[in-house]
UniProtKB/Swiss-Prot annotation:
The gene is ndhF. The chain crosses the membrane at residues 9-29, 39-59, 89-109, 125-145, 147-167, 185-205, 219-239, 258-278, 280-300, 327-347, 354-374, 396-416, 425-445, 542-562, 610-630, 719-739. This is NAD(P)H-quinone oxidoreductase subunit 5, chloroplastic. The keyword Thylakoid applies. PANTHER family: NADH-UBIQUINONE OXIDOREDUCTASE CHAIN 5.
Length: 739
């Protein structure tokens, strides 16, 4: 076993040869390298597959032996100070290694098809391979300073990939926003690392955990300083994992290519913050105030992310806010000490969200021939609809991913989310209520995304489409805005006399000629692809979707309990995940109870599934064909018209829409307070520098010049007069100097 562990340091380095080869190829033989660019995908996938095999082998040994292996070598030695560099292999590391490598391989395969026609194909593979290397190095780090080194590399790669299409001003602005926002968290992380080094004298995890065990009994360390340093460490995780209030970079990060969006949201960037907290949980567990703060931030984030996803029209941004909300669940679980549930949800969410993002990329590819390559159009769900007829494989995989994230059994996210909900209710009813309500919201907005994209009819053909926003459905709101002039009401999402309906995306009453017009764009699947209608993507992009679908269907079973032998009070709880995550310290609430109550599990499951089904039902009523049926009933329409509360409900809808579509006004607040405030401060500084500092300097010089010009005419041009005045000046100077 130890023989295998000794070569674990190879795992983060395996993708590097391809990166270096592509770099040297572009420098030495650029023409040949670019002509053979598609070949470079194979070694990238191959080397990461080898890393995956190593990771699986290490994980099997962890499950069988539950041992921890650490190897260190000195990097810097100076008197009593020693900075070590090495790697740590434990259950947490092995889980993250498998997660990163499996998702990374599928994203690389998908990227070969998605980026095949892009001029930056090689550059993209260099960035994404280095991204994988950085994340693998981060999860195998053995101390805080090593984590910080790879932490910054992960941030750099995300900056390069978010701004991959840097010629687009929006993408350039998005990567800068992500970089600046994460600098806030990274600065806090660095201060926290330095603070704990000053307190403990070590950066190694094992030393920190040993000292943390003695904090409460000895009470020899300033608790305020320790809490402050722990808060600074947590600030780094807040920025990286897009937690409130440093979440604003995540939706804008969707300006990058879709494969990198999948990798960031599933296994790399946002997972780094959760990993850091999980790694340092034995340290945080000794600070109850920090644990309460972590759970509070997670609760706010999971609810805020769900509300902001309600009215988004961009398919990728809707999924981004979904990620933000699910990361809030993980943060809540860590804050209440539910270590296993947090990591379980990290695993299940990673595969489901990777499936959804890659599926959205397939949808975007199918829409681009119709609406163009601008993300404002190709990612706009207002222009989609009815895609189930044209891309059935993508539709099937996307549906399963949606149901998984909604918490429908027996899909992956059901098991992990149900565990978090149960533990949150046990910890605090306040957290339990918000987490449960958000679970219903999750089902609603996720099924909304599915229905807008695949349900109904293809809306882009309902008018004479053009590239201008004013003449397209781009400006049509799904939440009750008025219909722009020039748009035929027969072709608008469900309408009333005053405007577009709050939720529905279907036509309440479709005329016969309209159906014929829709039918003219429909052909049977399998016919020759044309640009008149969307079509399925190639096998290179479909294969990862099918593999991720298998993970979504079956990965949740690693957390299902099975009988480990009869006990006096019940049945002993044992899962593959719990055996895998056998911790050296029992710092989770759920692990302290070794018994599982089947009745309690069924009760909790029924409650969570009921919430999910209710959210799906509401979404179907507002977005599905059922809404059109009810809209056409004169009795219900007349009842709604006579209802005195209708105006109040409409106002509530508009307020919810404004809150969600404007991102909770948080971005506007940051722009006005920080961006405009800093710009105003720089303008004031510039005025002070040029007007005051430079003014004084230039004024002294100008005054000296003017005085000199006046004095030179006093002597009348005679040398004797100049000598006389010179002696007078010297005499006055000596008088004051000597006195």
């Amino acid at each position: 076993m130890e023989h295998t562990y000794q070569y674990a340091w190879v795992i983060p380095l395996l993708p590097l040869p391809v990166i270096m080869s592509m770099g040297f190829g572009l420098i030495l033989i650029p023409t040949a390298t670019k002509n053979l660019r598609r070949i470079w995908a194979f070694p990238s996938v191959l080397l990461l597959s080898i890393a995956m095999v190593f990771s699986v082998q290490l994980s099997i040994q962890q499950i069988n032996g539950s041992s921890i292996y650490q190897y260190l070598w000195s990097w810097t030695v100076n008197n009593d100070f020693s900075l070590e560099f090495g790697y740590l292999i434990d259950p947490l590391t092995s889980i993250m290694l498998i997660l990163i490598t499996t998702v990374g391989i599928l994203v690389l395969i998908y990227s070969d098809g998605y980026m095949s026609h892009d001029e930056g194909y090689l550059r993209f593979f260099v960035y994404i391979s280095f991204f994988n290397t950085s994340m693998l190095g981060l999860v195998t780090s053995s101390n805080l300073i090593q984590i910080y080194f790879f932490w910054e590399l992960v941030g750099m790669c995300s900056y390069l990939l978010i701004g991959f299409w840097f010629t687009r001003p929006i993408a350039a602005s998005a990567c800068q926003k992500a970089f600046v926002t994460n600098r806030v968290g990274d600065f806090g992380l660095l201060l926290g690392i330095l603070g704990f080094f000053w307190i403990t004298g070590s950066l190694e995890f094992r030393d920190l955990f040993q000292i943390a065990n003695n904090w409460i009994p000895n009470n020899g360390i300033n608790s305020l300083l320790t809490t402050l340093c722990a808060f600074l460490l947590f600030l780094g995780a807040v920025a990286k994992s897009a937690q409130f209030p440093l979440h604003v970079w995540l939706p804008d990060a969707m300006e990058g290519p879709t494969p990198i969006s999948a990798l960031i949201h599933a296994a790399t960037m946002v997972a780094a913050g959760i990993f850091l907290l999980a790694r340092l949980l034995p340290l945080f567990i000794s600070l109850p105030l920090i644990m309460s703060f972590i759970s509070l931030v997670g609760t706010i984030t999971l609810f805020l992310g769900a509300t902001l996803a309600l009215a988004q029209r961009d398919i990728k941004r809707s999924l981004a806010y979904s990620t933000m909300s699910q990361l809030g669940y993980m943060m809540l679980a860590l804050g209440i000490g539910s270590y296993q549930a947090a990591l379980f949800h990290l695993i299940t969410h990673a595969y489901s969200k990777a499936l959804l993002f890659l599926g959205s990329g397939s949808v975007i590819h199918s829409m681009e021939p119709l609406v163009g390559y601008s993300p404002d159009k190709s990612q706009n769900m207002v222009l989609m609809g009815g895609l189930r007829k044209y891309i059935p494989i993508t539709r099937t995989t996307f549906l399963w991913g949606t149901l998984s994230l909604c918490g429908i059994p027996p899909l992956a996210c059901f098991w992990s989310k149900d565990e978090i909900l149960s533990n949150s209710w046990l910890y605090s009813p306040f957290f339990g209520i918000i987490a449960s309500f958000t679970a219903g919201l999750t089902a609603f907005y996720m099924f909304r995304i599915y229905l807008l994209t695949f349900g109904g009819y293809l809306r882009v053909h309902f008018q004479n489409y053009s590239s201008t926003k004013e003449s397209s459905l781009y400006s049509i709101s799904l939440w009750g805005k008025r219909i722009p002039k020039g748009v035929n009401r027969d072709f608008v999402l469900s309408t009333t006399k005053s405007g577009v309906s709050f939720f529905s995306q279907n036509i309440p009453k479709i005329q016969g000629n309209t159906r014929n017009r829709i039918g003219s764009f429909t052909t049977s699947f399998g016919a020759k692809n044309t640009f008149a209608y969307p079509h399925e993507t190639g096998n290179t992009m479909l294969f990862p979707l099918l593999i991720l679908l298998l993970f979504t269907l079956f990965i949740g079973f690693i957390g299902i309990s099975f009988d480990n032998g009869g006990m006096d009070n019940g049945i002993a709880e044992l899962t593959i995940l719990s055996k895998w995550l056998t911790p050296s310290k029992n710092f989770t609430q759920e692990s302290s109870n070794s018994f599982v109550n089947s009745y309690e599990f069924i009760t909790n499951a029924i409650s969570s599934v009921t919430l999910a089904i209710f959210g799906l039902f509401i979404a179907y009523i507002f977005y599905g064909s059922a809404y059109s049926f009810f809209q056409n009933l004169d009795l219900i329409n007349s009842f709604v018209k006579r209802n005195p509360k209708k105006e109040f409900l409409d106002q509530v809808k508009k307020n919810i829409y404004s809150w969600s579509y404007n991102r909770g006004y948080i971005d506007i607040f940051y722009t006005r307070v920080f961006t405009l405030g800093i710009r105003g401060l720089t303008e004031l500084t510039e005025f002070f520098d040029k007007g005051v500092i430079d003014g004084i300097t230039n004024g002294v010089g100008l005054a000296s010049f003017c005085i000199g010009e006046e004095i030179k005419y006093v002597g009348g041009g005679r040398i004797s007069s100049y000598l006389f005045f010179f002696l007078c000046y010297v005499s006055v100077f000596l008088f004051f100097f000597l006195s």
